Amino acid sequence: MAGKTLVAVFSASGVTKRVGEEIARIAGADFFEIVPKEIYTDDDLNWMNKQSRSSVEMNDPSARPEISSTVSDMASYHKVIIGFPIWWGVAPRIIEAFLESYDFSGKTIIPFCTSGGSGVGRSDEELHKNVKGNVEWKKGAQLNRPDETVIRGWLDEVL
């Protein structure tokens, strides 16, 4: 697990954050929460309402929700583990905003997701479009309520 690692996660409900914090603890990595400038309310997250904020964002490929803070020294990280819930079969638009905000050249990006119903789906490949430069991508994993053994096994594969 050589090189400095960052675990960056977006979590609307707290599930992905808990998994990300556990990954960071086990990997000895730094943790960064991707927090939207405007926090999502329960109404915003109502996927059954086509007019909810999350529905509108996910139906607009150009939507990029603002992020409230930045990673202070992204250049110091060699590996970035990015966690997110699956929305509409892919990563939420805020993950695209995060990936477009930094130069990941020469870094390894390792995505993971949480999902109540669907798996990684096409989210893994879709993220590649948002990153410029020479980046090594590791295959994404779905980690729903993993125990320490599962996380360690996954980290051994990707770090």
For the regions a language model picked out, list residue spans one by one.
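Short, glycine-/small-residue-rich phosphate/pyrophosphate-handling segment
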Residues: 110-147
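Conserved strand-to-loop "acid loop" that flanks and positions the catalytic carboxylate
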Residues: 84-85, 113
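Structured beta->alpha junctions
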Residues: 11-12, 87, 116, 143
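N-terminal beta1-alpha1-beta2 submodule of the flavodoxin-like/Rossmannoid cofactor-binding fold
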Residues: 1-82, 89-91, 96, 100, ...
